[in-house]
């Protein structure tokens, strides 16, 4: 009979190993509540203690890399909530637990509720990014839902006054701690939406323990924030404090002061941007005016080159040259005719053809008359064309405009005055008239209506 059961016989080592594997694989991590006793901390930094209740106890160990994350010092007799792995110490066969985290019993229960509500609302989509409303930019009125006596309100108002003193602020005072706080926060959110006075809400309070911040882990508050038509910025506690309200809000600020920074404009920065824009505009105007001034100078020089008086002088010079050429040509023709006449006379004298001489003389006289008339006609035509050109040039000349009583005024640096803002009282300006120039001092500047 013994031989048939030898396959089921365990050594002590194998038994303890099998039990350890069963405990670790089947149980996994569990939450255990109990009272601490026999707490010790040797030089290694590990914690060793017993966790017990009224009828049982179990040995516990919490290694240094885990207990350094515990925010309090465990005390004998303290009720705690421990998240641990169940195992067995094989050399002695001692059953024990290895703690991974530890919380005071009250906070531990709240943490469980927090995780359950977080999972529930997440599954319903209340945290989805698609539901987040954009914040107004800039905000025209800020609503603040917090305690009227808390430090958070003071911090928010201080930042808003520093950054944007003209920004209107509406305070919806509520309790932020205690049994009545969630209901008051919900009513304040609903009131702000009903009134429609502001375009962004800051909902929050200062720092505290998990119990102090619990109002912002309330399901009613979370759903009120989600239903708000006004964008909500959550500002609960410090940067390390994360509440359900932070997940539901359109934007989470790490602190109340940071929330005020987010919803407000920095007027000093805005002023600097305006001043920078003014400087750039001034530089652009200076460049534009300098460019127009250069363009005006170029046009002015071109007009001077094409001034009617200059063109008239050139025409007169050309006409004088033509007259000289015509005179030279006439003299040459007369000289040639005279020479021909002399030759003919000589020939006639030699041949004495009197009738032919008379005819030749008559022909010469006719030619001289026709030549003279032709010259006179050409001169008359040239004078008429020259007169027409002068009349046309005078019609388009700026001097003609001056002759009608208009004037052109310029500053001391040669810029043409178009608007009164180009001069001020005491400036000297130069005015061009039809027959000359005059300088005058500006006594006063009066804008036109």
Curated annotation (Swiss-Prot):
It holds the Pfam family Exonuc_VII_L. It is found in: Cytoplasm. One of its GO terms (biological process) is DNA catabolic process. The keyword Nuclease applies. One of its GO terms (cellular component) is exodeoxyribonuclease VII complex. Keywords: Cytoplasm, Exonuclease, Hydrolase, Nuclease. One of its GO terms (molecular function) is nucleic acid binding. It catalyses: Exonucleolytic cleavage in either 5'- to 3'- or 3'- to 5'-direction to yield nucleoside 5'-phosphates. The keyword Nuclease applies. Its EC number is 3.1.11.6. Heterooligomer composed of large and small subunits. HAMAP family: Exonuc_7_L. Belongs to the XseA family. Bidirectionally degrades single-stranded DNA into large acid-insoluble oligonucleotides, which are then degraded further into small acid-soluble oligonucleotides. This is Exodeoxyribonuclease 7 large subunit. The gene is xseA.
């Amino acid at each position: 009979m013994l031989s048939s059961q030898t396959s089921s016989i365990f050594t002590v080592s194998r038994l303890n190993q099998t039990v350890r594997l069963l405990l670790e694989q089947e149980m996994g991590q569990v939450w255990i509540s109990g009272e601490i006793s026999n707490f010790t901390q040797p030089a290694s930094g590990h914690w060793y203690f017993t966790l017990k209740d009224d009828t049982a106890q179990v040995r516990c160990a919490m290694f240094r890399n885990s207990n350094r994350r515990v925010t309090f010092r465990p005390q004998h007799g303290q009720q705690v909530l421990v998240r641990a792995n169940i195992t067995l110490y094989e050399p002695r066969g001692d059953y024990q637990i290895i703690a991974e985290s530890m919380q005071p019993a009250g906070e531990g229960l709240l943490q469980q509720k927090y995780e359950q509500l977080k999972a529930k609302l997440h599954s319903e989509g209340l945290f989805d990014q698609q539901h987040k409303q954009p914040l107004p930019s800039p905000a025209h009125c800020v609503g603040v839902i917090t305690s009227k006596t808390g430090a958070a309100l003071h911090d928010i108002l201080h930042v808003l006054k520093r950054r944007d003193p003209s920004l209107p602020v509406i305070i919806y005072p509520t309790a932020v701690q205690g049994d009545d706080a969630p209901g008051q926060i919900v009513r304040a959110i609903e009131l702000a939406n009903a009134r429609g006075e502001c375009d962004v809400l800051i909902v929050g309070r200062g720092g505290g323990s998990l119990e102090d911040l619990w109002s912002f882990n309330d399901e009613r508050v979370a759903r009120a924030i989600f239903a708000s038509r006004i964008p909500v910025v959550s500002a609960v506690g410090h940067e390390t404090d994360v509440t359900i309200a932070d997940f539901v809000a359109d934007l989470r600020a790490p602190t109340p002061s940071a929330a005020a920074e987010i919803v407000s404009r920095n007027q000093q920065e805005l002023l600097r941007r305006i001043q920078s824009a003014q400087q750039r505009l001034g530089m652009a105007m200076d460049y534009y005016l300098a460019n127009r001034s250069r363009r005006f100078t170029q046009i002015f020089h071109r007009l001077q080159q094409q001034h009617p008086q200059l063109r008239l002088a050139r025409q007169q010079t050309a006409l004088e040259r033509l007259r000289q050429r015509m005179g030279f040509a006439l003299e040459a023709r007369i000289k040639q005719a005279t020479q021909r006449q002399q030759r003919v006379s000589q020939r006639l004298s030699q041949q004495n053809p009197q009738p032919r001489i008379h005819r030749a003389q008559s022909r010469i006289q006719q030619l001289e008359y026709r030549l003279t008339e032709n010259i006179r006609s050409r001169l008359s035509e040239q004078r008429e064309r020259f007169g027409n050109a002068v009349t046309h040039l005078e019609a388009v000349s700026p001097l003609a405009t001056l002759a009608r009583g208009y004037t052109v005024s310029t500053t001391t640096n040669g810029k043409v005055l178009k608007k009164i803002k180009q001069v001020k009282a005491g400036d000297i300006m130069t005015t061009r008239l039809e027959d000359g120039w005059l300088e005058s001092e500006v006594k006063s500047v009066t804008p036109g209506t």
